[in-house]
Amino acid sequence: MAMENDELKNLFTSALRRIIGKGISKKYKTLIEKAQKKRDTAPYGEKPDAVKTHLRDMIILPSMIGCVIGVYQGKDYVSVEIKPEMVGMKLSDFSLTYRPVKHGKPSIGATSSSGFVPLK
């Protein structure tokens, strides 16, 4: 998927444009190269193997579309399949480092008003 630089600039925020303008470092380039290599060697119709990385601040570029990247979240790796809608976002946006809290019903000792909760 070939995109012109002007089209890419419209997808990125000003902060991302500044980061891209400085240039992509070697560690990001090697991640892109590994992901593209896995994508190109995968059999037709199958997902490529995940490329594991700790680079959560990597900006998703159009050349990464179709790749599967394992993003480290502190304990294990979360597989993220790169889609066109993800261009311009960071890998960390798709791999939460915490579990959202699911609040249950109050029980005895939770608050002073929980004394009115009927017991089983």
Swiss-Prot record:
A Pfam family matched in the record: Ribosomal_S19
Keywords from the named record: Ribonucleoprotein, Ribosomal protein
GO molecular function: RNA binding; structural constituent of ribosome
Keyword check for Ribosomal protein: yes
Any Gene Ontology CC annotation: cytosolic small ribosomal subunit
SUPFAM superfamilies membership: Ribosomal protein S19
UniProt family annotation: Belongs to the universal ribosomal protein uS19 family.
Protein name (record): Small ribosomal subunit protein uS19
GN (gene name): RPS15
